[in-house]
Amino acid sequence: MKKIIACIGTFFALVTLSTQAKNPYLLQTADRSAMEHWVDSVFETLSPKERIAQLLVITVRNSDTPQNRKTLQRLIQEQKIGGLLFDSGTAKDQANLTNYCQSLSKVPLMITLDGEWGLAMRLSDTPRFPVNMMLGAVQNDSLLYEYGRAVGKQCRRMGIHVNFAPVLDINSNPRNPVIGKRSFGESLKNVSSKAIAYAKGLESVGVMAVAKHFPGHGDTSEDSHKTLPLVPHSKERLMSTEIPPFKAYIDSGLSGIMVGHLNIPAWDATNTPSSLSPIITRELLCDSLNFEGLIFTDALKMKGASKFGNTALRAILAGNDIALNPSKPEEQLNSILSAIEQGKITQQAIDEKCKKVLRYKYVFGLANYTPIKTKNLIEDLNAPEYDALNRKLNSEAMTLL
């Protein structure tokens, strides 16, 4: 794993923010032969249903209680899901639960974090870095890269492989109830440069960055947690304003993108959320923008998507690789199995996505999984280097504000 991380760091040291590479660097850092051998060896042990389950990441409680452990045991041993997203709690509980869940899983789990400005967005006993809107005032992008590396190191210490960050939404609508301080600002150029620097910092230490909320949640007046927001703009406006930060991110060789739940009639007039729309996810993101990394939906329990039914199946059909937190995972798995039997989706399509997920698990070091060391965990997460970085970020941001 140390060799992989060293290679990643070398890649990003040699590549500027304007690089036009499309293939994600995380995969390029791996020994291709060794990776494919591990992927094939794991894949061959999986039943058709278990291959589908690798495409689900489920949100779980971050509370280390006997009752929650029983719930997690059923989820992992019966449904054999591919990954977890812990909700808010403490670092100690999450570390203990991660070790417990990994010990139960047939295939090592992908552990994800919704940490737009670091662990403290979800974990109470960790350093609290400035929110993105404040970081947008930092002129030196190399400091944002350093910040990304720091968050990445903390993620690695916590056994976290994927961070659902950075936010690439442009804060262009003062009536937007959900983006606001989560955005790096109102300037397209500034949002792109800050977010990409942060993302490169994350990936330089082997943590996948997942930019969101494609194709752009900044200019809406509704919250996709509660409804399906309308984005009323023309294709020309979207391609000139909302899309460029994502295009720059893709061209920089970064690995993950999250598709939001948005109603965008200019592209898809069927009132279908972008996360469930083949036109937006497959045709625009994959075919037009040439994104070859891992595609996650936003959480499928959100009101912007949940009312459409069979959300995991629809998400996979639309072109996503990972269905994030659909309701009733067992029913979702069976729905996809039925769709294969009915010819709505092929087993080959599922197998290709399963292998894609396994390749990233290999890059994360899960071929040689080791439990989180809980001794000195809180001290390590609150090391003096992070406090010094925090002061530097606040100082540079406040100087400009």
Q: Where would I find each of the regions flagged by the language model?
A:
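Second-shell residues forming the walls of enzyme active-site clefts
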Residues: 47, 84, 96-103, 107-109, ...
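Bacterial Sec-dependent N-terminal signal peptides
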Residues: 1-27
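Active-site-adjacent structural elements in enzyme catalytic domains
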Residues: 91-108, 139-159, 345, 350-355, ...
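Preference for extracellular/luminal or secreted protein segments
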Residues: 20-58, 62-74, 287, 307-401
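Active-site mouth loops of central-metabolism enzymes
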Residues: 57-66, 133-145, 227-241, 301-305
